[in-house]
Amino acid sequence: MVGAVIVLGLIDRGSGYFFSLGTVFSVMQLFATLGPVALGLGLSMLVRKFDLSVSGMVSLAGCIAVLTGAANPWLGALLGLAAGVVSGLIQGVIMTRLNLSSVGVTLGGLLTLQGITYVLTGNQTVSYPDMTVALGLNAPFAHLFSVRSAVALAVFLLAALLMRYT
């Protein structure tokens, strides 16, 4: 890790653009997207399972949130989250009750979730009409964070607390 910081410092040498608040903000935005997905995969790997359905769930939850959240973004986000919970619950019950491999069950889940997304969208790109939601979620605060990255950090903190005290 120290070596990587030294190399990055040499790359930045005097320009001042690489090690900047803007770069940290950009990295945090990327973390806000990929961090929770990686956390879910990592937690499943801790219990010697592997969840291949994550990418299918991300696309389905996003589509559900966009398709149902035009009038009320909170409702869309809640329904997208609920879809993820229901999907995970179904796959978890199948694995535990039928004693099946997580790879097989979640691969089937991935294909099923992608199929549902395909049907919901008609294989078309869906867009969200209200850009003020995106602007609000991505607006910087404290020069380093956005609402999205703060939520991702909170999810990591919650996972750490659950792992520590359960």
Where are these regions (language model features)?
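Single transmembrane alpha-helix segments in multi-pass membrane proteins
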Residues: 3-14, 18-73, 93-100
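Hydrophobic alpha-helical transmembrane segments
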Residues: 27, 35, 56-57, 74-82, ...
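Alpha-helical transmembrane segments within multi-pass membrane transporters and channels
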Residues: 72-110
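Transmembrane helix-bundle core of multi-pass membrane transporters
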Residues: 98, 102-166
